[in-house]
């Protein structure tokens, strides 16, 4: 049985040159995807993508760079087969058609959770990319994140994202594009819209008052445990609303873990 492929497409209302730059210029990549990029995107070279706020990094081999239409990268996750990411861009009137294929996933139940998590990640990332290009192209950002293991099933976590008290007042999350309005635990009013919804694994909220994004995620560890996380960033980090939201992440996550029954065995919130 062959390896499985994840696909994601999106029409982005920006010219191909801008979308290509967002995938290949390290400064622009750091504006929406990895927080830091080391290396050159040249065929045969290797690049490292770093998420410093999460303590994560991956190394990728550059397989093909066909400016401004096609980019192919390959990486080998620990203990798993190699995976290949292909990004293709095409003119679509006054916009760009983005097509992503990410292959090399184990078929069937063996790779089901990794496929689902990666698919959720690409749905979120592509919508964040569109938001970045529409409002903040070329701007740098400041990121903060918090992670915690929790003794809860994946499907039990997402409903609590909307529960008052853990992060803010009541946070009603609708479909992609729907407006949001809530108050932080400190009482500050925030407004924005849902950028991406890939529940129960991820949700991304564009926050107008912070000039940034809040991503909530849950990663299944086993049938009774998960890793929950919150990541916030801003392209205008001097805004007081961003500083307040970023400072609230760790205590807010501790409250969420407590509401779910406590940390998973071997971890602490």
What are these regions (language model features)?
Residues 1-7, 13, 261-269:
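Actinobacteria-biased recognition of intrinsically disordered, low-complexity terminal regions
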Residues 7, 14-18, 24-70, 142-145, ...:
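Short beta-edge strand/loop motif at the mouth of beta-sheet-based domains
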Residues 18-20, 153-159, 239-244:
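Short, conserved charged micro-motifs
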Residues 20-23, 32, 75, 122, ...:
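Signature tryptophan residues that serve as conserved aromatic anchors
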Residues 70-120, 195-258, 267:
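Beta-strand/loop substructures that line and gate deep hydrophobic ligand-binding cavities in soluble
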Residues 106-159:
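Surface-exposed beta-loop interaction hotspot
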Residues 123-134, 250-264:
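Short amphipathic alpha-helical signal-transduction/dimerization elements
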